Every structure is written in C-alpha cells, then in structure tokens.
C-alpha cells in the first residue's frame, strides 16, 4: 500500500503542475485544479458510463502561470484597486482595460505548445483532422454554495486550432467582466484566489439538443424527469431564445407521461467561419417533435444513471449528433 500511496501522491503532484489535464484524468474532487465544469465532465467521462465528447482542461494552474510569467498580476491588482465600485463607468472602464490586457499578452511559448499539441492529440483520439471544439470557461469557484459564478464566463463554439489560444485567453479574461468583479468584491472573494480553467471539448454538431432535469423544477416532484429539446445547437435552449418541446418521463418506469411539442422555427447552427449563426428551421420540421420516443427514454436512462452516481438531482445539457 505504501508504494500505491507514493504513486498516487506523485500523480496528484503532477496533476497540480500540469498545464493540460485530460478529462479521463479528472474527477469531481478536482474542482480546484480544473473548475466545476471540467471536473464534472471528467467524472462523467471516466466514472458514469454515459457518452461524453472527449477533451481536456487547460488547468487553473496554467492561468496562474500565465499571470505570473506575463507579470499581469500586479497590473490587474492596481486596476482593481483604483475602481470606485459605486461608479458603473469606473467599473466598466477598468473591466475593459483588464480584459484587453489579458487578451493582448502573448501566450508563453511552452504553454501555447502544450495546449496546441493537446489539440493535435485530441484530433488523433477522435479520428478527425481538424476537430471543431467548444472552448468553455470552468471557474474554480463557480460551484461553491452561495457563490454562483455561472453565466459570468464565456463559451466559444466551433473553434479550430488557429483561434484556440486566443479563445483560451478570452475565457481567462471573462473572469473580469464588470459583473464578476463587482460580485467577487460583494462576496469578499480576493480576485487572486478565484482561478479559472478552460474546457476544450470536441464539438458535437447536434441535430437536436436541450436540457434534462432529473426532478421537476417547477413542482419539485422527484419521481419525474423533464426533458426540453429543440433543433440545432443547445445554446438556443439554454439562452431561452426558443420555446423547446417538453417531455415528462416517469423516473421509476421510464414511461413517457406527457409530450408538449411547440413550433420551433429558429435554430443555431455552426458556420464555415468558425462560429455559429441563427437560421430558419425547414418548414417540415417546425412543428415536429425534436426527438423520437426511443431517444427520450435513452436520455431519461442516462439522467437516472447520472443522478444515482451523484446522489442529488441534476440538470444536464445534452445533444444528439447528426
């Protein structure tokens, strides 16, 4: 057991110093290293047996190293110290200056190489060159009770190698939106203790996507699963810009209890320029259910698996690829 302990200690020490951590290496207790999003993607990828697109985290340590190596830390602290928190304009100006600073600094060479070579390895693992990826912020404090940082950091879809490092820096700089700066000040967080990781994940070009709740969010009924679905990429549902179809499933029997299908005339799709756009849904699909009964049951089954693993109700973003 002693040898095992040493080996685990070495692995943990390596984990702590790595710029890149693959999902398969991550577990939910790794939130300090990789943020809530990446740690839980790692847990789902390696432990739960549900299909999760592969990817890696640019670690919180990498962000810390970036600030140190580029000497940005002191400049950021000085800019924050000068803010008059009562004055919105002062807050907005400082936020813009900090974001421009972080995004404008060159990525240290060894760090950039580590991220780009991991992207190359992801292409190999997925068996596609090039692979479009989603680049998403994963804040180390976003899932702390009473400190909801969710929605205050950025997500970039349909990213390729040429803009990957730029998008990583934009995720880092999104820690300094006016709202996030103000929020941390209000809650008494030091800006230097809130680190950010970035998820780089194979992008699923979804025909249909949505959100699933393993408990009825309105009534609180723990025996029901609610699934929302719409055409195209999931941002449309998450942002609340379309009215998705809604399916009600009995958790114990996986029987579909109710289906409410709405007109869905707009969807988000990826475009050739490496971003996304809104398009009109073909007329033949606008009033059609976005998922089949078999898919509804399969999703509900995954929902039960995930809830059982975590021991608490979950809300889960999902996608069905083309």
Where are these predicted regions, by residue range?
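Short loop/turn segments at secondary-structure transitions that flank enzyme active sites
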Residues: 141, 206, 233-235
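Short, electropositive, low-hydrophobicity segments enriched in small/polar residues
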Residues: 39-40, 46, 59, 155, ...
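Segments forming glycine/polar-rich beta-alpha architectures that bind adenosine-containing cofactors
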Residues: 208-209, 215-216
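N-terminal beta-alpha lobe that positions the nucleotide/phosphoryl donor
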Residues: 2-4, 9-199, 208, 279, ...
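Short conserved micro-motifs at the rims of enzyme active sites and ligand-binding pockets
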Residues: 146-148, 211, 236-239
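Conserved catalytic alpha/beta cores of large enzymes that bind or transform nucleotide phosphates
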Residues: 224-315, 320-321
């Amino acid at each position: 057991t002693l040898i095992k302990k040493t080996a685990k200690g070495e692995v943990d020490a390596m984990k702590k110093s790595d710029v890149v951590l693959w999902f398969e290496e991550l577990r939910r207790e790794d939130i300090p290293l990789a943020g809530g999003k990446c740690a839980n993607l790692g847990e789902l990828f390696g432990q739960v047996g549900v299909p999760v697109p592969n990817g890696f985290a640019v670690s919180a340590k990498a962000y810390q190293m970036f600030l140190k190596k580029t000497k940005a830390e002191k400049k950021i602290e000085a800019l924050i110290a000068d803010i008059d928190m009562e004055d919105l304009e002062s807050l907005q100006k400082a936020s813009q200056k900090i974001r421009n600073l972080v995004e404008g600094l060159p990525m240290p060479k060894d760090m950039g190489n580590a991220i780009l070579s991991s992207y190359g390895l992801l292409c190999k693992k997925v068996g596609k060159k090039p692979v479009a990826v989603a680049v998403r912020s994963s804040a180390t404090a976003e899932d702390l009770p009473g400190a909801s940082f969710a929605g205050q950091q950025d997500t970039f879809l349909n990213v390729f190698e040429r803009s990957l490092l730029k998008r990583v820096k934009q995720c880092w700089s999104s820690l300094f939106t006016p709202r996030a700066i103000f929020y941390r000040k209000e809650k008494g967080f030091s800006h230097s203790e809130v680190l950010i990781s970035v998820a780089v994940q194979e992008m699923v070009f979804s025909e249909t996507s949505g959100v699933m709740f393993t408990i009825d969010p309105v009534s609180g009924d723990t025996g029901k699963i609610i699934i929302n679905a719409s055409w195209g990429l999931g941002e449309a549902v998450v942002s609340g810009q379309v009215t998705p179809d809604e399916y009600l499933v009995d958790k114990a029997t996986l029987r579909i209890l109710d289906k409410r299908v709405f007109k869905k005339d707009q969807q988000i799709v990826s475009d050739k320029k490496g971003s996304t756009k809104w398009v009109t849904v073909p007329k033949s699909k606008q009033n059609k259910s976005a998922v089949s009964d078999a898919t509804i049951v399969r999703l509900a089954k995954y929902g039960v698996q995930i809830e059982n693993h975590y021991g608490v109700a979950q809300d889960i973003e999902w996608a069905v690829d083309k």
